[in-house]
């Protein structure tokens, strides 16, 4: 499995710009639009195919920001950036080529210009590493014919993430998946997102450690943990700072971790 992971930097037209808190839908539109520019067939296939699309992306971040009270957006300054990851070369090639072909980008009414696309290095090891979300993790299950959001306080959360990883492993490798996977939640913060007009999703910003089969964990790192990765959920980075901190405390003690931590840059 090849990891194709990119940091995409954009320069705003204005010194100060808005970024709505519910913005994954706009990034999804950008990704599909640029893929369509260079590979219309692939764009149609991704639109029509059900199940995991085998790519994920982060929230849109800024080098500096302010949070005006009572508004549905924050104010960004300097550069904006986001991360994109896939294991499918055709998807990576189409999206990145499309960005360079049309470097002027309009998102939620703000204009940006492509400044840099940087290929990121792959961590050497995954099992035992600490991860932090770059976009929140979404997990759902069906009960009585309805789908419900599942939280890390429920046992099903962990089993569903493992089964989701195994399904993606089969899609990518075409072979029986390993079953060895555990995750230890260090900190968590719930977030409710409007993924499309009138459609909401409860998801979780997490700091967690993952243990088990390195290749199975690698699947989550490459194409996302949990569900709805192609809608902007489940992207993580390895948190280098926490590698040096062994006794951080229990899940319950860490529920109020700094929500800005997930917006730091990294691999």
Swiss-Prot record:
InterPro entries: Cas_Cas6_C, CRISPR-assoc_prot_Cas6, CRISPR-assoc_prot_Cas6_N_sf. Keywords: Antiviral defense, Endonuclease, Hydrolase, Nuclease, RNA-binding. It comes from the Archaea. The keyword Nuclease applies. The keyword RNA-binding applies. The record marks 53 as: Transition state stabilizer. One of its GO terms (biological process) is defense response to virus. The active site is at 32 (proton acceptor), 47 (proton donor). Its EC number is 3.1.-.-. GO terms for molecular function: endonuclease activity; RNA binding. Belongs to the CRISPR-associated protein Cas6/Cse3/CasE family. CRISPR (clustered regularly interspaced short palindromic repeat), is an adaptive immune system that provides protection against mobile genetic elements (viruses, transposable elements and conjugative plasmids). CRISPR clusters contain sequences complementary to antecedent mobile elements and target invading nucleic acids. CRISPR clusters are transcribed and processed into CRISPR RNA (crRNA). This protein processes pre-crRNA into individual crRNA units. NCBIfam families: cas_cas6. This is CRISPR-associated endoribonuclease Cas6. The gene is cas6.
């Amino acid at each position: 499995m090849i990891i194709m992971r990119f940091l995409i930097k954009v320069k705003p037209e204005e010194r100060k710009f808005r970024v709505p808190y519910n913005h994954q839908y706009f990034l999804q539109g950008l990704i599909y639009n640029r893929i369509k520019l260079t590979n219309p067939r692939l764009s149609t296939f991704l639109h029509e195919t059900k199940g995991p699309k085998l790519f994920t992306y982060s929230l849109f971040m800024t080098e500096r920001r302010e949070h005006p009270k009572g508004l549905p957006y924050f104010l960004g300054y300097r550069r904006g950036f986001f991360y994109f990851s896939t294991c499918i070369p055709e998807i990576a090639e189409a999206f990145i080529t499309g960005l360079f072909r049309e470097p002027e980008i309009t998102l939620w009414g703000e204009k940006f210009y492509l400044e840099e696309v940087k290929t990121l290095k792959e961590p050497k090891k995954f099992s035992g590493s600490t991860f932090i979300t770059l976009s929140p993790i979404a997990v759902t299950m069906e009960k009585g014919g309805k789908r419900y959001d599942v939280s890390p306080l429920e046992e099903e959360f962990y089993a569903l993430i493992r089964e989701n990883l195994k399904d993606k492993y089969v899609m990518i490798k075409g072979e029986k998946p390993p079953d060895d996977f555990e995750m230890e939640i260090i900190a968590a913060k719930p977030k409710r997102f409007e993924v499309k007009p009138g459609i909401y999703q409860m998801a979780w910003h997490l700091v967690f450690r993952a243990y088990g089969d390195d290749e199975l964990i690698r699947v989550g790192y490459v194409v996302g943990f949990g569900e709805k990765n192609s809608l902007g959920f489940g992207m993580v980075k390895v948190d280098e700072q926490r590698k040096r901190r062994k006794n951080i405390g229990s899940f319950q003690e860490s529920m109020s971790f700094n929500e800005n931590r997930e917006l730091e840059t990294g691999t």
